A protein has these predicted regions:
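Cytoplasmic helix-loop-helix junction between adjacent transmembrane helices
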Residues: 98-136
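C-terminal ends and interior cores of transmembrane alpha-helices
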Residues: 76-91
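Helix-loop junctions at membrane interfaces in 12-TM secondary transporters
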Residues: 3, 87-99
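Helix-to-loop junctions at the C-terminal end of transmembrane segments
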Residues: 54-67, 153
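Helix-loop boundary and gating motifs at the non-cytosolic
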Residues: 1-52
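Residue-level signature of mid-helix packing/kink "hotspots" within the transmembrane helices
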Residues: 48-56, 142-143
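C-terminal membrane-cytosol helix-exit motif in multi-pass small-molecule transporters
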Residues: 150, 169-179
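Glycine-rich segments within core transmembrane alpha-helices of 12-TM secondary carriers
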Residues: 129-149
């Protein structure tokens, strides 16, 4: 298997770990930040809107310029989103938190392209194995993400749940080195 496919698998694992962190804590944070519990899922909705809005444009951008540029933009979007989410948590502001999750959604939408990048990196005979390897990064992330969210939840005692988004920022920084 080409070395780049392994790097793509690690990068997808990082992005998916970030998604698992968000899924683990977003609604709980939304409930704490909203005046009305009815709005507690708005941040998660915002993330999915970001994902949906990013998927097709990022695919075109990667096709026209390069996959690397798209993945770098995805990482930066994730970092911006995680930082805005932290600001929302610190200032008890549902709007900032929701906008932050919109940007993490863009990052997750970008991550959908890793499997296609694996196809470009692997010889035709190894396409199925390459996609399988890259997608297996999501299995590791399903375990690591929620665990990391719990472990970092009280990282900043004054601001519960700022820790997971600090970890998320670091994850997106690390992901920059894997494509």
């Amino acid at each position: 298997m080409p070395k780049n496919v392994w790097w793509l698998a690690i990068a997808l694992a990082l992005f998916t770990t970030g998604n698992a962190i968000v899924l683990s804590v977003a609604v709980v944070i939304g409930e704490k930040l909203s005046v009305d519990p009815t709005y507690s899922t708005v941040p998660l909705l915002s993330q999915y809107i970001g994902l949906i809005m990013a998927t097709i444009p990022i695919a075109y951008l990667m096709q026209k310029y390069s996959r690397k540029l798209g993945f770098i933009l995805g990482s930066f979007s994730g970092m911006i989103g995680a930082i805005l989410s932290i600001v929302g948590i610190i200032y008890y502001n549902l709007t900032y938190f929701s906008i932050g999750l919109f940007f993490t959604g863009i990052a997750i939408g970008t991550a959908q392209q890793f499997r296609f990048a694996a196809l470009e990196e692997a010889p035709k005979a190894l396409h199925a194995k390459a996609v399988g390897l890259v997608m297996s990064g999501g299995i590791a992330a399903a375990l690591i993400g929620p665990t990391l969210a719990v472990m970092t939840q009280r990282f900043f005692t004054e601001y519960p749940f700022a820790g997971p988004f600090s970890a998320l920022t670091l994850i997106y920084v690390i992901a920059l080195f894997y494509y």
